[in-house]
C-alpha cells in the first residue's frame, strides 16, 4: 500500500469521525443537552464533545463502530485518562466550576441504527 493510499484511508477515517461527532451532538441536543464544544483540544488531549444539562458537565467520547460493545471497548484506559485530564483543564476555566458535577459518557454511532448513549461510561 502506497503513501497516497494510506493518506486516503486516513482522510476517510477522519471524515467519518467528524460526521459521527456531529451526529452524536445532534442526538444529545435532542435529549436536552446544550453543546458547549466539539473537538475541544487542550495540551493534555482532546474531548470529542463537551455538553451541559443544568449543573452537569458531560464529557463525551464518540466512537463509530459496527456494534455497541466494540464502541465501548475502543475507549482505552489511556484515552480515559487523557479525557479526564483535558476535562480538568476545561473545568478550571469555568466561572461556575464549584457547582458543576461532571460525568464521562460514550456515544456509539453504528451504521443503520440510532446512536447509543452510555451514561457514566468511565
Swiss-Prot record:
Gene3D superfamilies tied to this protein: 3.40.1350.10
InterPro entries: Restrct_endonuc-II-like (IPR011335), tRNA_endonuc-like_dom_sf (IPR011856), UPF0102_YraN-like (IPR003509)
A Gene Ontology molecular function term of the record: nucleic acid binding
Paired cysteines (S-S): none
Similarity annotation: Belongs to the UPF0102 family.
HAMAP family, per the entry: UPF0102
NCBIfam families for the chain: PRK12497.1-5
Name under which the protein is recorded: UPF0102 protein RL0336
Amino acid at each position: 500500500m502506497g503513501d497516497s493510499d494510506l493518506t486516503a484511508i486516513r482522510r476517510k477515517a477522519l471524515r467519518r469521525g467528524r460526521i459521527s461527532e456531529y451526529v452524536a451532538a445532534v442526538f444529545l441536543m435532542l435529549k436536552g443537552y446544550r453543546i458547549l464544544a466539539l473537538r475541544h483540544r487542550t495540551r493534555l488531549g482532546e474531548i470529542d464533545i463537551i455538553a451541559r444539562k443544568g449543573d452537569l458537565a458531560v464529557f463525551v467520547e464518540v466512537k463509530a463502530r459496527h456494534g455497541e460493545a466494540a464502541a465501548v471497548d475502543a475507549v482505552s484506559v489511556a484515552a480515559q485518562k487523557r479525557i479526564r485530564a483535558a476535562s480538568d483543564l476545561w473545568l478550571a476555566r469555568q466561572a461556575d466550576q464549584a457547582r458543576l458535577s461532571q460525568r464521562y459518557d460514550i456515544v456509539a454511532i453504528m451504521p443503520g441504527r440510532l446512536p447509543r448513549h452510555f451514561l457514566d461510561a468511565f
